[in-house]
Regions:
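Flexible, compositionally biased loop and terminal segments
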Residues: 1-243
Length: 243
C-alpha cells in the first residue's frame, strides 16, 4: 500500500494496534432522513454511500475482517413497504458493489437466515459469495436477517440433529455450528446513531469485544469517525479476564 493511498491516520506516522475483526451496527438512516426532511428510504440510500466508503477505508487500513449488521431478525416488525424497499435496494447494491469489491480482493459472506429473504436478494448474495469465494483480502460479512439468539438456537438444533455426544461439545465445536464459523471473534464493535446497546448482535462472538459508541448517524459516518474509533481501540488494554 503506497503512502499516497494510506488513510490520514497512518500518513501521520502514528503506530496503532489495529483490530483484526471490526463489526459495525449500522444505525441512524431513518433519523438522518427525518432530520433532513426526507423520506426514510433516502436515509437508506445515503447509508449505502457510507457502507461503500467505510469498506474502502477499512480496506486501506488492512483490516482483515469486517462485519456489517444491516438487517436484524427483529427488523421484520417495521412497516412492510419500508422493508421491501430496503430489500430491493440491497439486491441492487450487492450486485453492483460485489463487482467492485471483487477487484479489491474482498471475500463476501452472509450471516443469518438467508432462506427467509426475498428470492432476488438471496440470489444476489449467492452470486456475490460465488464471485468472491477465492479472494484472500478482507472478508466482508453481511449480516442480513441476523439475530444473535437465533444464531445460537440454530447452532444447538444442528448439533442435536447430527447426534453429537454431549461430552464432545465444547466452545471450539460450538463455534463450528455458528453462522460465523471460520471467522475470528470480534475485536471491536462500532455502533453509530447514539444508542448504547448491542441489539442482539454477535452475542457469542463479542464476549471480549471492545465497544465504540458514537452519536454520529450512519450516513454521516466517515473517515474521521473511523479514525476516532481506531485511536480509541488502540489506546485500550485488553485483558481477556486476566490482570
Amino acid at each position: 500500500m503506497s503512502s499516497k493511498t494510506r488513510p490520514v491516520l497512518l500518513a501521520k506516522g502514528k503506530k496503532l494496534h489495529l483490530p483484526n475483526h471490526i463489526a459495525i451496527i449500522v444505525d441512524g438512516n431513518g433519523r438522518w432522513a427525518e432530520q433532513h426532511g426526507l423520506p426514510r428510504f433516502e436515509g437508506h440510500l445515503a447509508g449505502i454511500e457510507s457502507v461503500r466508503s467505510t469498506i474502502r477505508c477499512l480496506n486501506q487500513y488492512q483490516i482483515k475482517y469486517v462485519t456489517l449488521y444491516g438487517f436484524s431478525t427483529e427488523n421484520w416488525n417495521r412497516p412492510k413497504y419500508e422493508v421491501m424497499n430496503l430489500f430491493r435496494l440491497l439486491e441492487e447494491i450487492v450486485d453492483k458493489e460485489s463487482q467492485e469489491l471483487h477487484k479489491l480482493g474482498v471475500k463476501i459472506r452472509h450471516l443469518g437466515r438467508l432462506e427467509e429473504l426475498p428470492q432476488g436478494l438471496q440470489q444476489a448474495i449467492n452470486r456475490a459469495i460465488e464471485l468472491t469465494k477465492n479472494n484472500t483480502g478482507m472478508t466482508l460479512s453481511l449480516a442480513f436477517n441476523y439475530g444473535g439468539r437465533t444464531e445460537i438456537l440454530d447452532a444447538v438444533r444442528a448439533i442435536i440433529a447430527e447426534g453429537v455426544p454431549p461430552q464432545s461439545i465444547n466452545e471450539k465445536l460450538f463455534n463450528n455450528y455458528l453462522y460465523t464459523a471460520g471467522l475470528p471473534d470480534v475485536d471491536l464493535i462500532i455502533r453509530t446513531g447514539g444508542e448504547l446497546r448491542i441489539s442482539n448482535f454477535l452475542i457469542w462472538q463479542a464476549s471480549y469485544s471492545e465497544y465504540y459508541f458514537t452519536d454520529v448517524l450512519w450516513p454521516d459516518f466517515g473517515e474521521k469517525e473511523i479514525e476516532k474509533a481506531l485511536l480509541s481501540y488502540s489506546q485500550r488494554q485488553r485483558r481477556f479476564g486476566g490482570l
